[in-house]
Every structure is written in structure tokens, then in C-alpha cells.
């Protein structure tokens, strides 16, 4: 994997970025002037980071695995020690699909109904492969989301969730906290 150098990261034009960043040259970054990256972050091949005007912040010690899309028009905040597995899509904005309006970016704004709400991912969260996270979701500290899940609602801390749509499966151990 080929990663950007510190000089190349400066030229991308991030609002702010920390140290020890491993960002693949095969990732795509849109509107970097509104993206804040902390320390010790790895972003793998074929990821998309697309910021709007709302907060788009990745704190420290975060891994964004290959093929993850972060659509941040409504804002995305990912707190420290969180990880997102391959193929997951995180949407802070979406059209409404209830049939009361038209959908898609090629339709005039007045004919659309947009849902725009920030995604908050607290510390120690892990999201499995190929999940979809919808606008307005807050994943509280320590949440784990199983692979192929539809995350259409917020999740209480230290729970393991899965399914489409998600449901609480069981409590998650907090033993990992003793490792820090």
C-alpha cells in the first residue's frame, strides 16, 4: 500500500491534521478544508472522505479499512480508538424514500426532501464489514456492530448490535479499557 507523505498531506489542504497518518494514495478526499484528522490514523485503499460544511473530525488511533465511504455533508465525528471495517458506508445525508418527493442529485432541490443529520461515533466503537449507517445515528462508547448490519438508529453504550435493521444482541465486555 502506498501512503501520502507529510508534505503531500499538507498540499491536500486539510483544516488540521496530526502525526503518524497513513492515508492511501488510492483514497479520495473531497472538501479537505473542512476535515480534521488527529494522530495515528490509517485510511486504506479505495476509501472516500466527503466533507460538507459541518464538522468532519477523526480523532486519534482510528482505522478506516478499505472501501469505506464517509459521506459527511451533515457532519461526521469519529472519536478515538474506533474502527470501521471494509465496505461500510456512513451517510450523514440522504434523500427521503417515502414517495412524497423525487430523489437524486440531478433533481431540482425544491422537488426533493433531504435528511441531513450528523453521525457521532464515540470512543472504542467497532463497525463490522459492509454495514450501512444512516443519518442522525449516534453510536455510544464501546458499541460493536456486526457485519452486514443496517444501522438505522442510535445504539446504547457497550452493546453488541447486528442485523438489518440492527437490534441489541448482548452486552460487550469493557475489558479492553484496562489495556490503555
Positions of the model-derived regions?
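Short active-site oxyanion
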Residues: 67, 141, 157
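Conserved beta-strand-loop-alpha-helix hinge in the C-terminal portion
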Residues: 157-159, 165-180
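Flexible, glycine/small-residue-enriched loop-and-beta-strand segment within the central core
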Residues: 27-37, 42-135, 164, 170-173
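Short-chain dehydrogenase/reductase
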Residues: 63, 126, 144, 150, ...
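Short secondary-structure boundary/capping segments
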Residues: 13, 19, 111, 117-118, ...
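Beta-rich strand-turn-strand
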Residues: 120, 130-143, 149-152
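Extended, small-residue-rich solenoid/repeat segments and analogous flexible loops
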Residues: 1-36, 40
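Flexible glycine-rich beta->alpha loop in the catalytic core of nucleotide-sugar glycosyltransferases
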Residues: 88, 95-96, 138, 149-150, ...
